[in-house]
Curated annotation (Swiss-Prot):
GO biological process: translation
Gene3D superfamilies: Ribosomal protein L11, C-terminal domain, Ribosomal protein L11/L12, N-terminal domain
Protein name according to UniProt: Large ribosomal subunit protein uL11
A GO-annotated cellular component: cytosolic large ribosomal subunit
Leader sequence residues: none
Modified how: One or more lysine residues are methylated.
Highest taxon listed in the record's lineage: Bacteria
Keyword field: Methylation, Ribonucleoprotein, Ribosomal protein, RNA-binding, rRNA-binding
Protein family: Belongs to the universal ribosomal protein uL11 family.
A Pfam family this chain is assigned to: Ribosomal_L11_N
PROSITE patterns associated with the record: RIBOSOMAL_L11
Function text: Forms part of the ribosomal stalk which helps the ribosome interact with GTP-bound translation factors.
One MF annotation (Gene Ontology) recorded for this entry: structural constituent of ribosome
Length: 142
């Protein structure tokens, strides 16, 4: 018989840097999850990723206070900012452009994000990422 799910927690935690301080501690503490157990498991799983990159994680908490978690790829906005070499996107994306990304960079990001995107193929994934880039005030070249 399957365990009964008591809650799902969605967080964004830096790769290899989960610790009991907010936002991780309070979110898990409310559901009665062993915080240190999660932190150790998360840090072990994300140890090979780039340190400090934000990793969305979905934690499923069960009735017996056990948990499972699934990590996703870093947000497209983080990858785009890194590719363009900027700190933040534009406050006015249609009038104020803050950087440039090439089609090759978009393809690279789309390949990395492919497991999390609902796009039918790589071309559709690239178009999705290009739309995100334009909405951040980046110019897409190519």
């Amino acid at each position: 018989m399957a365990k009964k799910v008591t809650g799902i927690i969605k967080l964004q935690v830096a790769a290899g840097a989960a610790n009991p301080s907010p936002p991780v501690g309070p979110a898990l503490g409310q559901k009665g999850v062993n915080i240190m157990e999660f932190c150790k498991a998360f840090n072990a799983k994300t140890g090979d990723m780039e340190k400090g990159s934000p990793v969305p994680v979905e934690i499923t908490v069960y009735e017996d206070r056990s948990f499972t978690f699934e990590t996703k790829t870093s947000p497209a906005s983080y990858m785009l900012k890194k590719a363009a070499g900027i700190k933040s996107g534009s406050g006015r994306p249609n009038t104020e452009k803050v950087g440039k990304v090439t089609l090759a960079q978009l393809e690279e990001i789309a390949k990395a994000k492919e497991p999390d995107l609902t796009a039918a193929d790589l071309e559709a994934a690239v178009r999705t990422i290009a739309g995100s880039a334009r909405s951040m005030g980046l110019v897409v070249e190519g």
